[in-house]
A protein has these predicted regions:
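N-terminal strand-loop-strand
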Residues: 1-16
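Detector for methionine-enriched segments
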Residues: 1-4, 62, 120
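Unchanged
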Residues: 21-107
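Charged phosphate-binding loop/patch that engages nucleotide di/tri-phosphates or the phosphate backbone
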Residues: 101, 105-121
């Protein structure tokens, strides 16, 4: 998970790595780019999970999102990393039991996230 700083409110929020799709990017290419920008890490064995509509609080307002969710494996991840995204304060592996209380998503998105994480264990 990544801890981000809202540019307007300066509030710290936890999220999964992600963000917008740039022009001519596929959702998968965008997911790989966002993971690297926000954690400094790359992953392999990517698989599409689902698409979800939700609102995400950012920059002092609720932003409507159409999320393309993927799972991936991150082999050989160390604690050293370079974060490229200026809004990301830190990244961390969070114990599964703490994910729901930390995620800044709406309840239905938190539930789906936990569902997919449990399926991966």
């Amino acid at each position: 998970m990544v801890e981000m700083v809202d540019p307007l409110t300066k509030k710290f929020i936890w999220s999964l790595p992600g963000g917008g799709i740039e022009q001519k990017e596929t959702p998968l290419v965008a997911a790989k780019r966002e993971l690297f920008e926000e954690t400094g890490h790359e992953a392999e064995d990517w698989a599409f999970l689902e698409q979800t509509r939700y609102d995400f609080g950012w920059n002092g307002r609720m932003v409507p999102c159409l999320g393309e969710w993927f799972r991936a494996r991150t082999p050989n991840v160390s604690d050293t990393h370079t974060i490229i995204d200026a809004h990301v304060r830190a990244w961390a592996w969070i114990p599964l039991g703490q994910v729901s209380e930390r995620l800044a998503y709406q309840p239905h998105v938190r539930w789906r996230t936990l569902h997919h994480l449990r399926d991966m264990i």
